[in-house]
């Protein structure tokens, strides 16, 4: 029972750290960089809320379905009762929290040390330049790609080292998710694996 409480506390702590990173970024950093591309995700979130579907009719694209981006999380914040930039900030923080948690889980399986994996995950989610501020943590247009790429590569490495087929399933799930959203980018990421 004590082990369960210890693990539960650890997972809740990781989630809170991810949420804090998202809130700090969207409240104190990103308002200075918010622009029309970011607002497009907010418009998509409004359409998700109004139509009640993840892929609204007017936003269905052939090569990019944008379902793993920030918009569903903004729509969730809208449902909760937030509006305007507050909905964007809360939704963005929730999205960062989700991707941070997934990233930390995968890295911890690879490293075997939960503290070191938390440090690596935190370093990954600290913006070091304008692209990180805008694309990775602001619009979050590339955040899912980064985490899913980690989710593709590290389990394959673990499979090669330990021959555990469950890690191939995790990698395959990431490929399927990425392919469903962005087929062309997925091809770029998995092309090196095809060569081997």
Model-predicted regions and their roles:
Residues 1-6, 56, 109-110, 156-169, ...:
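Membrane-interface junctions at the ends of membrane-embedded or membrane-associated helices
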Residues 1-23, 167:
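Start-transfer (signal-anchor) and selected internal transmembrane alpha helices
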Residues 16, 90-115, 151:
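Transmembrane-helix motifs of polytopic, lipid-linked glycan transferases
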Residues 27-36, 49-72, 79, 85-86:
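Membrane-proximal lumenal/periplasmic loop motifs of glycosylation machinery
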Residues 40, 102, 142-163, 167-170, ...:
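Specific aromatic-rich, kink-prone transmembrane helix
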Residues 63, 67, 114-160:
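Membrane-interface micro-motifs in multi-pass membrane enzymes
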């Amino acid at each position: 029972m004590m082990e369960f409480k210890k693990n539960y506390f650890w997972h809740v702590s990781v989630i809170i750290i991810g949420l804090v990173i998202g809130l700090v970024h969207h409240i104190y950093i990103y308002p200075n960089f918010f622009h029309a591309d970011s607002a497009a995700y907010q418009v998509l979130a409004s359409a998700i809320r109004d139509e009640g579907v993840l892929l609204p009719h007017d936003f269905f694209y052939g090569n990019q379905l944008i379902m793993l981006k920030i918009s569903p999380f903004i729509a969730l914040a809208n449902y909760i009762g937030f509006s305007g930039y507050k909905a964007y900030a809360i939704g963005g923080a929730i999205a960062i929290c989700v991707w941070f948690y997934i990233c930390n889980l995968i890295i911890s399986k690879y490293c075997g040390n939960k503290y070191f994996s938390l440090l690596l995950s935190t370093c990954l989610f600290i913006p070091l330049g304008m692209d990180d501020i805008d694309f990775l943590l602001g619009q979050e247009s590339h955040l899912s790609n980064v985490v899913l790429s980690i989710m593709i590569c590290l389990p394959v490495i673990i499979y090669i080292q330990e021959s555990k087929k469950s890690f191939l399933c995790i990698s395959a799930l990431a490929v399927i998710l990425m392919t469903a959203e962005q087929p062309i980018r997925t091809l770029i990421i998995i092309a090196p694996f095809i060569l081997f």
